[in-house]
């Protein structure tokens, strides 16, 4: 039952917007749970959240044929402003069902599921004479989020009549220009083994690792995370500066990857000097370009994820399932593939299907010592073209770390 006439009308309005405009994303500036109340208005939104989300997803599933291409964001899912204080066991479930959004806060480490940070260029509502965040600060926040499995919502503060200051416009132009130059390290990029530090930020995509060097110099730069001993990095074959594809001299050793960027050059079209002279992105090619368990295109039903495992898993994360019937699905172009998973962490059976047909099973046996990055299945030769690969839990504990595509 609804909490108030206001909540009743709100529900109808949201339903009307979903059906009429078919949005890809709905943002709610309110808490998902019922133990925090925004602005002192007890309208019952927390108790309506399951109904709103279910309605949004069910309608979208019919429109997108079950591809789950929509997202809803709410606040107060765990963290400092947790709105599930009355039922904390719900946080883990809700975290997988929507994207949690928080003002001015970036998660401290890589997260298993996506999150959003909200930042404003100035105040949320225009203040005459107020100071602006720099383009450099916005890019720093953006890449910190992307590297930890998050995204950034940027509020461009407007005057009451809808226009923006020239300063705000230039900041947006600088941010947009930097993203345009380095977009392959941003759009659809996924977290690497580690997110980085105050000097370098990592992302990955399409078999490449990207390192954002915040303060480049002509002195050698050492990146320990990309050493020859890393569980997620193979033999590095090429390093290039993304903005001009210039080859960067490098040496990979057990201590790390040493780069010689040379004298920093100013990026064209950016007025913010710190951003124009710094924040250089390098593209790193290596021979361990596996498809990770959370790469774009993966569709799951019932599976859970762990990240920051620090146990030797590829990209330091893992997808796993404890429930029969759970499915992990992806469509890839491959003539042959191998499944990488830890052997020994649990006991269960996983069925492998290609284009809907049974091609084999993987048996996981509990062992005293877990062998990470084990090849647990290799397919026979497939016809040329794209194939749907599906992993189905038949019983017990099963997992996937990566797929090697041939």
Identify the role of each PLM range.
Residues 1-286:
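Mature catalytic domains of secreted/periplasmic carbohydrate-active enzymes
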């Amino acid at each position: 039952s609804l909490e108030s006439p206001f909540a009743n009308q709100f529900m109808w309005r949201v339903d009307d917007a979903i059906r009429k405009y078919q949005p890809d994303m709905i943002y709610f500036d309110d808490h998902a749970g019922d133990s925090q109340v925004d602005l002192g208005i007890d309208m019952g939104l927390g108790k309506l959240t399951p109904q709103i989300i279910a309605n949004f997803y069910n309608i979208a599933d019919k429109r997108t044929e079950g591809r789950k291409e929509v997202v809803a964001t709410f606040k107060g899912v765990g963290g400092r402003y947790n709105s599930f204080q009355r039922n904390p066991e719900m946080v883990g479930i809700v975290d997988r069902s929507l994207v949690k959004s928080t003002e001015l806060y970036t998660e401290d480490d890589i997260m298993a599921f996506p999150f959003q940070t909200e930042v404003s260029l100035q105040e949320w509502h225009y203040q005459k004479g107020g100071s602006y965040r720099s383009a450099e600060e916005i890019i720093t926040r953006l890449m910190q989020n992307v590297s930890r499995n998050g995204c950034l919502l940027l509020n461009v503060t407007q005057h009451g009549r809808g226009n923006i200051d020239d300063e705000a416009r230039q900041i947006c132009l600088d941010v947009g220009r930097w993203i345009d130059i380095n977009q392959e390290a941003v759009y659809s990029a996924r977290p690497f083994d580690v997110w980085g530090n105050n000097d370098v930020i990592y992302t990955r995509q399409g078999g490449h690792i990207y390192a954002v060097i915040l303060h480049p110099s002509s002195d050698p730069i050492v990146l320990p995370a990309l050493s020859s001993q890393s569980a997620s990095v193979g033999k590095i074959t090429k390093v290039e500066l993304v903005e001009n594809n210039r080859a960067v001299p490098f040496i990979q050793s057990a201590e790390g990857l040493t780069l010689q960027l040379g004298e920093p050059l100013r990026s064209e079209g950016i007025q913010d000097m710190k951003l124009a002279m710094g924040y250089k992105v390098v593209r790193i090619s290596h021979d361990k370009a596996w498809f990770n368990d959370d790469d774009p295109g993966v569709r799951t039903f019932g599976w859970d994820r762990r990240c920051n495992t620090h146990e030797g898993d590829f990209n330091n994360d893992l997808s796993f399932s404890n429930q029969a019937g759970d499915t992990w699905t992806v469509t890839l172009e491959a003539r042959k593939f191998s499944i990488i998973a830890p052997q020994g962490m649990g006991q269960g059976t996983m069925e492998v299907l290609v284009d809907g047909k049974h091609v084999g099973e993987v048996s996981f046996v509990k062992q005293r010592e877990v062998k990470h990055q084990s090849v647990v299945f290799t397919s026979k030769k497939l016809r040329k073209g794209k194939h749907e690969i599906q992993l189905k839990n038949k019983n017990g504990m099963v997992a996937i770390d990566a797929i090697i595509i041939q």
